[in-house]
Amino acid sequence: MASKVIRKFIQNAKLTVFSQEFIRLYLRGANVSKVIIRQTPIVNRVIIYSARPKMISEERKAHLAKLLELKFGLEKPVIEVLPIENPNLDAHVIAERLAMGIERNIRAYRRLAQRYLETIMNAGAIGAEIVIAGRLSGQRGKTWRFKAGNLRKTGTIGQFELDRAFNIAYLKPGVAGIHVTILKPDAEIPDIIEFKSPEEISIEEIEKIDKEIAEKMKKYLETYLLAKQM
């Protein structure tokens, strides 16, 4: 019984991953990011987050629904398209835009990578990295790495906080793989401590933790504010 449950769980996970990649490929150019598939006994909801939702017409959604049913056995899929809040901080969007940019102009890959890296950082990212691997110049395949800001790939941050994406640029010499990694501004970094100014300190909050420290802090604030007025 347990083995059947595990087998079904793995099959569902594989179905989700393969269908997500298929949707991104089918809707290439619409800058699809996150794809959520919610399976219920009545209907299967497919929620697609896109940076260009207007590109996904009702006709296109209907055709995609038929393909998902035929290829993946997803019965009665209902497709919903939602906009992305900040496309410049989305790894999937940046990876696709860069891949399509390189396809249009293979010689401009360095300039494009630098431009998108600046776009990510200007959007408020803590750190970002773009890696391009393939045969873009010369006979042999090479790897180019572009990095900005503070990007940590290990530990809790590397496991839970990084937004990663992979895309492929289809070129005449072959294909080029594009990896994009972004550490977003709202990421929780354990070893970064923010200090509040005296005006921002709440005595009520400190009292909940330690009344003695709250009393000392109250006296300090009174002295600080008095000195500031003088």
Swiss-Prot record:
GO terms for cellular component: cytosolic small ribosomal subunit. Keywords: Ribonucleoprotein, Ribosomal protein, RNA-binding, rRNA-binding. Residues 43-95 form the KH type-2 domain. GO terms for molecular function: rRNA binding; structural constituent of ribosome. The keyword Lyase does not apply. It comes from the Archaea. GO terms for biological process: translation. Signal peptide: none annotated. InterPro entries: KH_dom-like_a/b, KH_sf_prok-type, Ribosomal_S3_C_sf, Ribosomal_uS3_arc, Ribosomal_uS3_C, Ribosomal_uS3_euk/arc. Pfam families: Ribosomal_S3_C (PF00189). The keyword Ribonucleoprotein applies. NCBIfam families: PRK04191.1, uS3_euk_arch. Belongs to the universal ribosomal protein uS3 family. Part of the 30S ribosomal subunit. Binds the lower part of the 30S subunit head. This is Small ribosomal subunit protein uS3. It comes from Nanoarchaeum equitans (strain Kin4-M).
